[in-house]
Swiss-Prot record:
The keyword Cell inner membrane does not apply. The keyword Lipid biosynthesis does not apply. InterPro entries: PolyA_pol_cat_Poxvir, PolyA_pol_cat_sf, PolyA_pol_nucTrfase_Poxvir, PolyA_pol_nucTrfase_sf_Poxvir, Poxvirus_polyA_pol_cat_C, Poxvirus_polyA_pol_cat_N, Poxvirus_polyA_pol_cat_N_sf. GO terms for molecular function: ATP binding; poly(A) RNA polymerase activity. This is Poly(A) polymerase catalytic subunit. It comes from the Viruses. Belongs to the poxviridae poly(A) polymerase catalytic subunit family. The active site is at residues 192, 194. Polymerase that creates the 3'-poly(A) tail of mRNA's. It comes from Swinepox virus (strain Swine/Nebraska/17077-99/1999) (SWPV).
Length: 470
């Protein structure tokens, strides 16, 4: 045995390492030494400040926090499973090397906020948004309860923390969804804060530890296999606290965004296209029937922003939108005619099965596909004047061979996402797709073409049980 390494392991384990422990853990001695020399007093002080600033309503004494921290950092002393020791080392290493920069910094005085608040009065466009939403109320309500609807009592505290986090880390974390619209229109209500960031795993692990040390409760991180790079944090009752999509830094830099009070939000034009896409998802149409007012105010806010900032004239002239689309039932591929716009492609093949798209791209021997990850939920490839891409939502039919207008518009919006993200020509097709929303024909759904089934196992990080499977 190397005496220096053995001493580091002995100091960490509180016992002299067995031969098996030495040989399996010696590769981790640098990380273990970081844990050994970690200043727990300063860390406990940061936790107390975090608790005072963001969780002041929770009953927890300073001695409770200290006891919880010291108990966790001595956990390895009574652990003999090599697998569990590896998990403890990994989680402790993340905590001691990242917490101060990720969450601890939120307790210090932040930079001055440069007020850039832009409030939008939606009164003039709310009638249009109401008509649009009512035209989409064409489904019956399902009794199915989605898991994320079970909201933790900690959401309010975490939201307060997230507002500060978004300001401090606005180069690698941005928000979208209802909170971002609330910043544009205070009448928009929000639940949790939807975020995209480049270090989701580290952030959520640090947040899980913060909650554990303050509340004493075990929280669990889940990775969902059918959502790319998505993680959700759940409390001890399996209730939703916060979720996050992880994206690459180059994707972050590609996303158009606007700054409001030091917080970056995804440009509402991108969010509007994503909303039009989502309307093609059958369970989202069911949500509209349950609570149309919620969708109306969000849609109106997006429409008003885009109308003003992109100079859209609402006159009902929708040109070629939604674009002509035909569906091949056997191949599960939609062909979209795009040659009427100034796009770098003349037509588009929309695949409903992602694996089939990947296979066909491979056969094309083309290596210039671009993937915007969760922003578009698909890669895009342009080859020989044809775009190849994947559509992740259900497709609605109005007859056996005719795609419902809600879905043709959703497909068109998916194509416009590419144009927006690549800074291509957008004004005319954007004007057309928005004007196509005026005087929508309310049409029943003949059939729903299901989206492809994603397989895989949930990953989990459980601090209490020393489990990491992703």
């Amino acid at each position: 045995m190397n005496r220096q390494i053995a001493n580091i392991l002995e100091n960490y384990l509180g016992r002299y390492p067995s031969l098996n422990e030495y040989h399996t853990l010696k590769s981790q001695y640098r990380n273990i030494q970081k844990v050994n020399i970690f200043n727990k007093d300063i860390f406990i002080s940061l936790l107390r400040k975090n608790k005072k600033k963001f969780f002041s309503d929770l009953v927890c004494t300073q001695s409770d926090i200290k006891h919880s921290v010291l108990s966790y950092f001595s956990k390895q002393e009574n652990t003999y499973s090599i697998g569990k020791l590896y998990t403890i080392i990994e989680l402790q290493t993340i905590l001691v090397t990242t917490y101060t920069d990720v969450l601890g910094v939120l307790t210090t005085k932040g930079p001055d906020i440069f007020s850039s608040t832009i409030y939008y009065n939606i009164s003039s466009i709310k009638k249009l948004a109401t008509d649009i939403v009512h035209a989409m109320m064409i489904t019956t309500v399902s009794d199915k309860i989605m898991g994320r609807h079970n909201v933790s009592s900690l959401v309010g505290n975490v939201n307060t923390l997230m507002e500060e986090y978004l300001r401090r880390h606005n180069k690698n974390c941005i928000c979208y969804g209802s909170y971002s619209l609330h910043l544009l229109n205070p009448d928009v209500r929000y639940g949790d804060i939807d975020i995209l960031q480049t270090n989701s795993r580290t952030f959520l692990i640090d947040l899980a530890f913060l909650i554990k040390f303050i509340t004493g409760y075990n929280v669990v991180l889940l990775k969902v296999p059918y959502l790319k790079n998505y993680m959700v944090l759940k409390d001890h009752n399996d209730n939703h606290i916060i979720d996050s999509f992880n994206i690459r830094q180059d994707t972050m830099e590609t996303i158009p965004k606007i700054l409001i009070d030091n917080i970056y939000i995804v440009d509402p034009v991108l969010q509007l296209m994503s909303m039009l896409k989502m309307f093609s998802q059958i369970d989202r149409l069911e949500d509209i029937v349950k609570n149309p007012d919620k969708v109306i105010i969000r849609l109106a806010t997006l429409l008003e922003y885009v109308r003003i900032n992109y100079g859209i004239i609402l006159n009902g002239d929708h040109g070629n939108m939604p674009m002509l689309s035909t569906f091949n039932h056997d191949q599960r591929i939609i062909t979209v005619q795009t040659n009427m716009y100034n796009f770098p492609f003349k037509k588009c093949f929309i695949y409903l099965d992602e694996n089939t798209l990947s296979r066909d791209i491979l056969h094309l021997n083309a290596d210039d596909a671009v993937d915007f990850e969760n922003v578009s939920n698909s890669a895009y490839l342009i080859h020989n004047d044809t775009m190849y891409t994947y559509f992740s939502n259900t497709i609605l039919l109005r007859s056996e061979n005719e795609i419902h207008e809600i879905s043709t518009r959703a497909i068109s919006a998916h194509i416009l996402l590419y144009q927006i993200l690549t800074k291509g020509d957008i004004i005319q097709p954007l004007s057309d797709i928005i004007n196509s929303l005026i005087s929508i024909e309310k049409c029943t759904i003949y059939k729903v073409i299901q989206r492809d089934k994603k397989t895989g196992k949930h990953g989990i990080i459980d601090i209490e049980k020393d489990i990491i499977t992703h």
